[in-house]
């Protein structure tokens, strides 16, 4: 899952006017707020289950263009331009990031440790980040 939190998210690019909404049909990514990672680590230390592997993510895998669009809306800025993935100028590393969807589920950690993300959607997480910035 893509990690976001203070200093790491879409707001800087949207504010600078360099954000783009890369459109690739069917593309979704799972994300997780850094505070949710910390909470999961605390729970796993309190309830150790040696050998257990957990996927950490929020409950709402979403297309990257939706996240950029929502960040712009929260900032009251215009929607960044949409660019088709096939036509987008990107570094090879950035292009490889978009090569496939990166969607995972968090059911196991919820059941085993009683974990629930404080920010179950990117919308909740971005709103909290913006409130922290203010």
Region locations from a protein language model:
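Mid/C-terminal beta-alpha module of Rossmann-like enzyme folds, strongest
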Residues: 38-94
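Substrate-positioning beta->alpha
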Residues: 3-13, 21-45, 52
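Amphipathic terminal alpha-helices
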Residues: 120-134
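Residue-level signal for the nucleotide or nucleotide-sugar donor/cofactor binding architecture
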Residues: 32, 62, 104, 117-120
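Conserved C-terminal active-site "lid" loop/helix of NAD(P)H-dependent oxidoreductases
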Residues: 69, 89-116
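Residues in well-ordered alpha-helical elements
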Residues: 35, 65, 107, 120-123
């Amino acid at each position: 899952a893509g990690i976001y939190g203070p200093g790491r998210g879409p707001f800087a690019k949207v504010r600078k006017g360099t954000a783009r909404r890369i459109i690739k049909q069917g593309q979704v990514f799972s994300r997780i707020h850094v505070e949710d990672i910390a909470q999961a680590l605390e729970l796993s230390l309190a309830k150790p289950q040696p050998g257990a592997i957990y996927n950490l993510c929020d409950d709402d895998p979403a297309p990257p263009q939706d996240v950029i669009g929502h960040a712009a809306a929260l900032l009251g800025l215009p929607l960044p331009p949409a660019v088709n993935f096939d036509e987008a100028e990107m570094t090879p590393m950035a292009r490889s990031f978009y090569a496939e969807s990166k969607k995972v589920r968090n059911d196991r950690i919820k059941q085993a440790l009683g974990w629930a993300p404080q920010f179950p959607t990117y919308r909740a997480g971005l709103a909290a980040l913006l409130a922290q910035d203010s």
